[in-house]
Amino acid sequence: MPTDCISYQKSGYFSKLIVDYLDKKPELKELYNYFPSIENFKHQIEEKNHNFKNNDKRKILVDALKKQYTNFEISELTQKNIVLLENEKTFTITTGHQLNLFTGPLYFLYKIVSTINLCKELKRNYPEYNFVPIYWMATEDHDFEEINHFNFKGKKLSWNTASKGAVGRLSTKSLTNFFTVFKAELGLSNNAEYIKKLFSDSYLQHSNLADATRFLANKLFGKYGLVILDGDAAALKKQFIPYIKDELLYQNSNKKVLESIAKLKDYSIQVNPREINLFYIEANLRERIIYENGNYKVNNTFISFSETEILKLVDANSEKFSPNVILRPLYQEVILPNLAYIGGGGEIAYWLELKAMFDFHKVTFPILLVRNSAVLINEKQEKNRQKLNITWQELFLKQQVLIDAKTKEYSEIKIDFSEQKAHLKKQFEALHQIALKTDKSFSGAVKAQEKKQTKGLDNLEKRLLKAEKKMHSEKLKKIIELQNNLFPNESLQERKSNFSEIYVEIGEELINKISDQLHPLAATFSIIKHA
């Protein structure tokens, strides 16, 4: 592995479940279909092809996409990809993401680029098929607090407005004040002016968050053929009617997901299923459906249906039913000729709870791929790293661990009292032998003294480490500064910084560099160096 790549397993930023999945632990095998490899896509294509024979589904999908792209400037490649979806030799690779303001954290870009690059790689290996990258916009989510902000140069910029219901339908009118604040942070460079125009064209020229996000993602990635899909569409929901009815009448998803969760007893569970994994959705409303006393009630409202009434509503207005985190993946795979889902560690963790549910419904389970991750580093930072003689493996360490390790490396004194502790232990072993031959009270005194002296050595070791840190404080300060720049708040850069921060520095080079250097099947953190 190149020195400017870190394996996910060694990065320290992934859960035990994801590490074991990447290591292909046999105990997880029944929780997924095929492991992500170029060879396994052949089997996935065959299986999905067999289970997605309905050409009406393809036509409905294409018609829905054409409708959603009305009034949007569309690239030649995206247009071609939409038309190709009617062809039974065309398959999709999908990633999903919330409608975070101005894309939110950097990893949004990595998700999209991972998806685009995997399509390219598959086309090289399976030229007889077509592969279309899909960005599934999470327009039906209702947790506005998760998406109403982003960080720019360490500052949290928030859009404060009242929000109810699905965020995709939320008006963007109140973003004018936010834009005034953001503009002031950006400066006056050519790249800053581009970012201002991009924000304004996206959010101030479109009336709702779904359209604004589509415009933005299309502007950034349209030339790569990205197709952006909004699942909040009546024509698409109609195809999901049998699954909505099954959920309301029999709650099979709850039963099947709980079966999978039982097999994950050694891991932290990402999401727990509800009895009914559906929301009722209207303008300014998205609330859970609860079955109570023979009726279907909409949580936190007075809306209630009998069984007959709700089944009629499903047939007449399936768009009023919104799948939650458990059922949304099923909805996605029912309406798309999809081969793989690309997501972060948390997303892949909850997908691993779902295979039994997919098997029950006889829907092909997609290949699960952990998205690409990266750290962006400029020339000055890279020079500092080399000057300080820090490896990338070291920079991924927790800060305290890193500083302790570098202090020991720089010190001319051995900051390790293991020998002294071993010598002390040996001395007390002799004393314990003497204690066995006399009164019990002496044995207690020996134990207490051993504990006291061992603790004393521990404290002296800590004091020595502290003293050496003072001796090398200048070097250590530079290490802390470098790590804080690359790992803000001791977290991953990709979770804290917005793309605009880097774009202001390097412009279009940002997306070009990411596109050139992210390899979807590599399962490594990429270190991307830029000007």
Swiss-Prot record:
| Family the entry assigns | Belongs to the BshC family.
The protein's matches in HAMAP family, at most eight in alphabetical order, are given as:
BshC (MF_01867)
Entry keyword set: Coiled coil, Ligase
- Which Gene Ontology molecular-function terms are recorded? ligase activity
Segments forming a coiled coil? 447-481
Q: Please give the InterPro entries that the UniProt record associates with this protein.
A: Bacillithiol_biosynth_BshC, CC_BshC, Rossmann-like_BshC
Q: What is this protein called?
A: Putative cysteine ligase BshC
Question: Could you say which EC number(s) this protein's record lists?
Answer: 6.-.-.-
Top EC class for this record: ligase
Quote the Pfam families the UniProt record gives. Answer: CC_BshC, Rossmann-like_BshC
The answer to whether keyword Magnesium applies is no
Origin superkingdom: Bacteria
